């Protein structure tokens, strides 16, 4: 059986396709389209008709691929940008009518809860799973038998547009204070993945991360593209996404 997921995010629309059996699931293919919904939402409060038409066109393209690849089932979810736009329900209804498929707008806490479905998330103590998106950051921590989840209105695009708020940083700091035995951060999301791939690494020590992040921050956007091969919509936002990881690393005193 083939299944697919579609994530309407703040910085891009992404899809992953999997082959499943009763006992296994295997990743087959992925698609990414750089539609930055968050720019309109965080600047003007709502998604424009033009951007909605662009989104619909992208989703229809995905649907054609699903038909061609004989996908048996797929789900479309939307996160920070669609839940924060002032025309959220109107936008969802418009998209659903155009693509003839339901869209589920999930809360930040639901996003954080979904991290718990990671195969290792409920087996590894003292590790923080951190998903930094374009509009929000979700954290999942498992300390047997306690599960802790939280969502914060801090994300790469939000920071880039200077729409983050001091009280949200304070809320993050206060929440992290309760954890004094976290030994490792598992980073999820496009920014940390691109950063590690750029250095041909799967993991790194916190000191090394902070040093390499500082070096990256000092580069111009074109330099990041030329040196690391980042896409335009990754090169301009990656510093801001990594800034959130930097804050969490320091607050949790990760070595």
Question: Which residues make up each language-model segment?
Answer:
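Short glycine-aspartate micro-motif
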Residues: 3-7, 127-131
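Short, glycine/acidic-enriched loop or turn micro-motifs at the edges of active sites
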Residues: 10, 134
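Beta-strand initiation motifs
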Residues: 23-28, 146-148
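A structural signal for short, well-ordered beta-strand segments
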Residues: 31-35
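Active-site neighborhood of HAD-like aspartate-dependent phosphohydrolases
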Residues: 4, 17-20
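Short N-terminal binding/cap micro-motifs at the start of the first secondary-structure element
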Residues: 12-14
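Acidic, divalent-metal-coordinating active-site segment for phosphoryl/phosphodiester hydrolysis
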Residues: 135-141
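Helical "lid/coupling" subdomains associated with nucleotide-phosphate turnover
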Residues: 17, 40-71, 79-126, 141-255
């Amino acid at each position: 059986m083939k299944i697919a997921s579609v994530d309407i995010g703040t910085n891009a629309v992404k899809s992953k396709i999997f082959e499943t059996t009763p006992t296994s699931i295997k990743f087959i293919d992925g698609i990414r389209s750089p539609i930055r919904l968050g720019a309109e939402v965080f600047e003007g409060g709502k998604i424009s008709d033009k951007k909605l038409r662009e989104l619909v066109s992208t989703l229809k393209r995905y649907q054609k691929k699903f038909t061609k690849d004989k996908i048996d089932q797929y789900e479309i979810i939307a996160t920070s940008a669609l839940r924060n736009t002032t025309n959220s329900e109107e936008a969802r209804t418009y998209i659903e009518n155009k693509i003839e498929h339901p869209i589920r707008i999930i809360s930040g806490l639901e996003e954080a809860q979904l991290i718990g479905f990671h195969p290792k998330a409920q087996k590894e103590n003292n590790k923080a799973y951190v998903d930094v998106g374009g509009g929000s950051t979700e954290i999942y921590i498992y300390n047997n038998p306690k599960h802790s989840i939280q969502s914060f209105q801090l994300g790469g695009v939000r920071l880039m547009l200077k729409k983050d708020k001091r009280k949200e940083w304070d809320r993050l700091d206060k929440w992290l204070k309760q954890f004094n035995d976290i030994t490792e951060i598992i980073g999820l999301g496009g920014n940390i993945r691109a950063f590690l791939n750029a250095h041909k690494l799967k993991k790194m020590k916190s000191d090394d991360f902070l040093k390499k992040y500082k070096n990256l921050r000092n580069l111009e956007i074109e330099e990041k593209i030329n040196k690391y091969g980042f896409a335009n919509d990754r090169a301009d936002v990656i510093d801001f996404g990594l800034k959130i990881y930097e804050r969490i690393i320091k607050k949790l005193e990760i070595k």
